[in-house]
Amino acid sequence: MANRLQRGDRSRLLLLLCIFLGTLRGFRARQIRYSVPEETEKGSFVGNISKDLGLEPRELAKRGVRIVSRGKTQLFAVNPRSGSLITAGRIDREELCETVSSCFLNMELLVEDTLKIYGVEVEIIDINDNAPSFQEDEVEIKVSEHAIPGARFALPNARDPDVGVNSLQSYQLSPNNYFSLQLRGRTDGAKNPELVLEGSLDREKEAAHLLLLTALDGGDPIRKGAVPIRVVVLDVNDHIPMFTQSVYRVSVPENISSGTRVLMVNATDPDEGINGEVMYSFRNMESKASEIFQLDSQTGEVQVRGSLDFEKYRFYEMEIQGQDGGGLFTTTTMLITVVDVNDNAPEITITSSINSILENSPPGTVIALLNVQDQDSGENGQVSCFIPNHLPFKLEKTYGNYYKLITSRVLDRELVQSYNITLTATDQGSPPLSAETHIWLNVADDNDNPPVFPHSSYSAYIPENNPRGASIFSVTALDPDSKQNALVTYSLTDDTVQGVPLSSYVSINSNTGVLYALQSFDYEQFRDLQLRVIARDSGDPPLSSNVSLSLFVLDQNDNAPEILYPALPTDGSTGVELAPRSAEPGYLVTKVVAVDKDSGQNAWLSYRLLKASEPGLFAVGEHTGEVRTARALLDRDALKQSLVVAVQDHGQPPLSATVTLTVAVADSIPEVLADLGSLESLANSEASDLSLYLVVAVAAVSCIFLVFVIVLLALRLWRWHKSRLLQASEGGLAGMPTSHFVGVDGVQAFLQTYSHEVSLIADSQKSHLIFPQPNYGDTLISQESCEKSEPLLIAEDSAIILGKCDPTSNQQAPPNTDWRFSQAQRPGTSGSQNGDDTGTWPNNQFDTEMLQAMILASASEAADGSSTLGGGAGTMGLSARYGPQFTLQHVPDYRQNVYIPGSNATLTNAAGKRDGKAPAGGNGNKKKSGKKEKK
């Protein structure tokens, strides 16, 4: 009676469970992957279960989401409020997976109302929480003093339970004169440190050596452990023990009992006494193996003292050391293979089931979900599950070791009202082990995700001048769907770059997502591309997503510096710069100006003097390019100085350019013109005739000018003498004031400004001489005849002519303002000075400026065919940007002894006589400073 009541209660419970689960219609299995670092605090976030299941957090408890697998699942839990998978306890990767490099914990997540099972795989990421350590506090090694160099001595292995890069990586030995450290690899990838003797030992000199062995891992930060090593030098022991086998191999079943002998090793030593007694010990034995095996140090017998488990450790490799009393040792390897034994029967776990089914349910209706497991491996762990063939049901394998029990045909309640289904699981061991369970079933009267990119945007970098077809970047989109719905193809949006279709620059592999360059990019053309990658799955209808990708072109040093000044002539000639012989050290001769089309460090330029005809005479500013005198010019210095200046950028590798400068050393134009013939003859013998013509022409002009001056002087003396006679004859007449203006009777012709423009081009076949052209804008103001002397007359003549003039008249008169020039006419940065400012002509710089202007003008004319200087006065034909940045230095005045007939003015440069104004006609024929016309 009691049994009937129990059966009735059981039936009612099964009926209620069938009604509760009667609405279950589908099943779907998939795997969810998460990762979490070890030693994470309890309650830490692992993954968003609700999001991955497509549920709201509040629906998890309502729909019966729970973890159903066994094992290490107590380490994780589902938070019903947040819908997250969290840690439920301390996670120690070394405890869970020990030496396994990849540590995964698998569990199953069941959605109760839909009978869906999800595989959850959590990867435990190792952190560097363990430092390498040695089991011994101190290691003592005994070495014979007659040990030959190259002898090896075993060192202890450090232990680091971490894996991967955080595990033990290397060893270091403290510096010493006798020993070195070498690592010997093992079959499992580990390395054993060995102490190698590098030199002969002498016990009488040093009986012991203290060393320090340090083990380091590869974590960040690096952890290390050290053990002191004391090397004791012993007396002679000339034989080492020898094992009978170099490798001992043995296989033992996993169910071997404790205390059973595994094998016995044997080593012999021909020495006598203590040197022939061999002691056995494990060398560099792992802590886990030391708990299972033990070695008799006297006999060499290896025994099992712990329990073997094939499922944990399948193979052991140990080194056994045989050492005699003299400290010599030898090693052998013992390989123990654990053989699996079918000692575990399969286990059947019903994760979910129904106890009632509609009779008209279509074939394939899910009745129950079950899991079968076997702790054995190999054939012993291969499990097959089956049910009796006469039942209208069948088992289908779903995921891993999970099965679902479904109907194979339509059930008829009128024929059978209930079924007792027996499930049997059998492994493939010998003998096979099996397990079974029962399911009672009563027959009652009666389905997304676009591809997702891991990042919201990407940035890729490619150096310019890349080869066509080079791989630039790779994008990957993940689709949580499966099969066709997870097949992702990639494409680019149809955009344009500078009016050119994007497809002409880059392309993408539709299957792999690899981006390729179709052209060689130029950083100077454009520096970045903005792309948008589209990922589309193969579902129906297809779903897609896109992501932005910024492609940045990196600059390379592909442009050499370009020299702007001095410009390279088209006829192969070189421009000439002027440096007066009176120039002091640091005098600015010229400036080399260069630019680089690259950017950043590739465009940083430095200047250096590569070659000079007179070493040590000139120096070049490293960062400015200014060419200055390094010392005072000497008479022995050649008139023509050749300089080779190199301009180099800071790219990798650096690129450079060179320019050759020719500097003429002279104090004045006549000196240059006098030596011009010799300069040209030295430069090129073929131009000697042309140089001769130039010298003859200049000499002729000088002679004509000298004759003209003599005539004017004679005329002036004659007029003066005539005026004295008139004064003597007309003594009773009222005196007329002396005119303060120079007459127009021929003296004005002398006051015309003559410009001798000479183009000197070194190493050229051409030279130019432009004859003087008058400038009628200059006027000299006459002074009283007794205010100053005429230096060109001898003292006696002066006394006769001047008569009773004041003896102070020999003082130097103030300069004529007509010899002043505007600031804009001075060499320097073009356009940087106010054109209205005036200043006295620099001492002894008139010839220098004229020669430089003429040199630059001729260089420009050689390049563009022009007969003018091209630039404004004082600019030397340079633009405001690239003009040489220098100021002419003052040198001793030589014009204070020059007298101009018919005028009381001298070519002196007395201070304090400036009127701050430019002469009335001083700039009549001059142009403003400006950039040279480009052709």
Swiss-Prot record:
Residues 805-844, 905-935 are annotated as: Disordered. It is a single-pass type I membrane protein. Glycans are attached at residues 48, 255, 266, 420, 546. It is found in: Cell membrane. It comes from the Eukaryota. Its main location: membrane. The keyword Transmembrane applies. Residues 30-134, 135-243, 244-348, 349-453, 454-563, 571-677 form the Cadherin domain. GO terms for molecular function: calcium ion binding. The keyword Kinase does not apply. Pfam families: Cadherin, Cadherin_2, Cadherin_C_2, Cadherin_tail. GO terms for cellular component: plasma membrane. Residues 925-935 have a biased composition (Basic residues). The chain crosses the membrane at residues 694-714. Residues 30-693 are extracellular. Residues 1-29 form the signal peptide. SMART domains: CA (SM00112). Residues 807-844 have a biased composition (Polar residues). CDD domains: Cadherin_repeat. InterPro entries: Cadherin-like_dom (IPR002126), Cadherin-like_sf (IPR015919), Cadherin_C (IPR032455), Cadherin_CBD (IPR031904), Cadherin_CS (IPR020894), Cadherin_N (IPR013164), Protocadherin/Cadherin-CA (IPR050174). Gene3D superfamilies: Cadherins. Keywords: Calcium, Cell adhesion, Cell membrane, Glycoprotein, Membrane, Repeat, Signal, Transmembrane, Transmembrane helix. Residues 715-935 are cytoplasmic. GO terms for biological process: homophilic cell adhesion via plasma membrane adhesion molecules; nervous system development. Potential calcium-dependent cell-adhesion protein. May be involved in the establishment and maintenance of specific neuronal connections in the brain. This is Protocadherin gamma-A11. The lineage of its organism: Eukaryota, Metazoa, Chordata, Craniata, Vertebrata. The gene is PCDHGA11.
